[in-house]
Amino acid sequence: TACQAELALDAGGFPGSPAASAAMCAFACYDYPNGLIDSYDVVVNKPKTAAYRAPGSPQAAFAVESVVDELCEKLGIDPIEFRLTNASKEGTRRIEGPVYRRIGLVECLEAARSHDHYQTPVDAQPNGKLRGRGVASGFWFNRGFVSSCNVTVNPDGTVGVVTGSVD
């Protein structure tokens, strides 16, 4: 089994798109023995882009997961079963080298598969509108960056929290 992708990410007027992180995230949810990912930083005539909230990962995940859904539909395979069969798990080596520790992807997929919302058939609507159900997997690094906050318990029992993070 193999995976291949060519990614071209808009950098704006200067180099520095999230091309590398997109390449590392593209197939990160899947265990496959062979792969090739070419990722390009495309400089264009407009303002510089900058990282915000998992740069490159959503774009790569959308592309890969869309193709996975198309494969499942053409092959008549349940999307969660396909993902479970090919899921990265503890011990899986990513294409760029690191080996996963416990990541919980299989457990999440199994929980989704067994949930009533997934088991319930999607009925046709009397008003002619179409309904569906989607499944996707995604990945981002746990880099262990340090953050902090200052918590103050006030005399009246209220608590104040000050942090430099938007989260």
Protein language model regions, located:
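Acidic/polar loop patches that form or flank catalytic/metal-binding clefts of enzymes
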Residues: T1-C3, P79-I80, Q119-V122
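Gly/Pro-rich active-site capping loops and adjacent beta-alpha segments
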Residues: T1-A60, P126-D167
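N-terminal leader/propeptide and maturation segments of large enzyme subunits in energy/redox metabolism
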Residues: A51-Y118
